[in-house]
Amino acid sequence: MTITNDIRYIGVNDHDIDLFEGQYIVPEGMAYNSYAIIDEKIAVMDTVSADFGEKWFAKLQDALGGRKPDYLIIHHMEPDHSANIDKFISAYPEAAVVGNAKTFAMIDQFFGSGLCKNKLAVKNGDTLSLGRHELTFLFAPMVHWPEVMMSYDGADKALFSADAFGKFGALDCQDKEWDCEARRYYMGIVGKYGMQVQAVLKKAAMLDIKMICPLHGPVLTGDLSHYMSLYDIWSSYGVESEGVCIAYTSVYGNTKKAAELLAKKLEERGCKAAISDLARCDMAEAVEDAFRYGKLVLATTTYNADIFPFMRQFIDHLTERNYQNRTLGFIENGTWAPAAAKIMKAMFEKSRNINYIDTTVTLRSAMTEENAEAIDRMAEELCR
């Protein structure tokens, strides 16, 4: 696939994968992107996952048209992008492997020392001329590994962004809607590192970028302000959409009834409510919603003098990703010693700028008329 006259797409689609990184459900598969810049000198940008080495290598050879590459540029050492470095070096021993000091340390860890005999170590801001194309290297540490770097091609004004601006899904399954699976990808993979993403966005703002070539998902072209704006919101932990995320667990259905009643009361007031059963949903979708909306209500039971395991796991996912700048409410259920609200609130003690609504709803087994009235008050408070 030709992206520009000189930039060729040589990535692959993976429809065999069920869990990305061993945890994220990817019903539409995954794309492992790789690119080749064909100029006076040829640069190959990253490799692909191990299972697709032969397919990738065939696409690479087709793009080369009988020529030999001069460089293999490693933006990110995660194995879904680096697994075929050894195969590339075996086929093209005269090509230089381009990376930074941390890149080469990781190559030694994954492949053993001595693999890269011809290497070019670059620093932040260094340039590499291919002829018409000149690449500028921009370090992006912890987006989302410490060795990550991006490169900017001044000729075609393309940013090779590593995992940033990626999304779930194979390229032959992409629809027009980018935001949802890009958001789920960002919150799951990169969400913890908002400060580092903000630093990269500041670097990107200094460049004239016409296209973004990520390591997952489609090449982004046209008006890039939408994607940049979302990344700015996500990485600054801002509120993307007005609404309330309701996440619940329920043992016998009573807490579920309370959560569903709250959703109904919110919608009656014209407020968007996104509700998730944490025991049955894709938890990454629930995490996505918790970061998308400005308000979050957690509903669960006291369980073994703690909270229900799926709720604890969910809150851990949020706090590990620096959940902040949100308004929270609690619905708790306990037959003899309800303590879930207190326990959940304590889990957010180190989170920044978390506000709590006044109303906490406490069920003692089944929902009562008094509980229903409290839920109505909670909905009213959340809609202010």
Q: Whereabouts are the PLM-identified features?
A:
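Conserved beta-strand hairpin/beta-sheet module of binuclear metal-dependent hydrolase folds
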Residues: 2-60, 150-153, 157-161, 255
